[in-house]
Amino acid sequence: MTRANARELAVHLIYGREFTGEEPEQVVSIRLAKEYYAKLSQENDIYSERPSRAQTAYIDKVVSGVANRAEELNAEIQKYSIGWDVSRISRLTRSLMQLAIYEILFVEDVPTGVAVSEAVRLAKKYDGDDTGSFVNGILGTFARSLQYRISWNCYYSLYIIMRLLIAIR
């Protein structure tokens, strides 16, 4: 199973939690159990290959992370979805964007561009081309603003250090 497939599987689990309200650990352990997984493989090709231990750890990390930070992630989506209320965005699209923003902020080995392009690819696959454009717009704006926030924080930190060094002299 590729990382892209593991990401898609994680989206399925995040989306499923929207309906069940189950604890993230419970969702991952139940849905990835051998017996349950075998049933799912008959319904969707994404389940044809079981995830490795590393992929299972990634899936567990992102599903739990998105669940634990849902309010924060939704606030970021809301900030950049001008003219749209988060509650009006389809649950699947919201799940895709939550995962992408979580990956950008908290998963170090996932480049920002990969998180955005994978979310767009999955949005097009499940919700159509228009949704892919919508997701690309929101996540692209989020990523650019994040770069600005990071550079400003670095600049400000450097400024404080310089002021302290001057004060010490």
What are these regions (language model features)?
Residues 1-169:
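N-terminal interaction/assembly modules
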